Amino acid sequence: VIFDVHIHEKTYSSDSAIGLEEIVVEARRKGLDGICITDHESNGMASLAHEYWQDCGFPVLVGAEILTYEGDILVFGLQRLPRYKLHALDLLNLARINGGVGIAAHPYRNNGRGLGNRVKTLPGLSSFEVLSGRTEHPNNMKAIQAALELGLTGCGGSDAHELHEVGKFATYFPDVISTENDFLTAVRLHRHAPVYFDQGKYKLLEGEWRYTYE
């Protein structure tokens, strides 16, 4: 299955122009199997997203994009978000003890909000985006190289704030994702890989990229 793991919805992300229903319509049009809403410092969409999933049969998971002192991290499985800014390690520890996971968002983006080379050494980091929709290609390539050095595959996410951005990059999971726990397990076990949307379908990265599903 294929999920876009990084999307902002306008209710709780003031810089987003897109609502949940139109996000889902676009996601379905592009062939996504599910989406993750990751608003800035908020998981306020959780209840509505759960209801939408039950009513419409389209998986909508909710995490949050949290700015730490070292950079942005997508957290999932953390019901109560911190009320104040934390160091990345403290946020990851908080997620871990609550059964959640942390994914570094756009680690090499040149905006002062990426973890950079810390993705290579930060304990507790489950994955990181190697294909990020709002990140320039050379900086995504740095993330890809870091993943190769670590023997990991990494994630893909659009970081969509506009409708046309939804699904530009996404994450492939070889296993069925039918619950939040399925998603958390797949991320934790590195059973995922980045994909990009091209000519009407999603494609895995080729070349020297390594996959570790089996």
Q: Where are the language model's segments positioned?
A:
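Short, N-terminal intrinsically disordered low-complexity segments that are rich in Pro/Gly
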Residues: 12-17, 35-39
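Short, conserved beta-strand segments within well-ordered enzyme catalytic domains
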Residues: 36, 59-61
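Divalent metal-dependent hydrolysis catalytic cores, especially in the metallo-beta-lactamase
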Residues: 4, 24-41, 101-103
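Aromatic-lined carbohydrate-recognition surfaces of secreted/lumenal glycan-active proteins
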Residues: 103-111
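Charged catalytic cores and adjacent phosphate/nucleic-acid-binding surfaces used
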Residues: 1-9, 13, 19-25, 44-48, ...
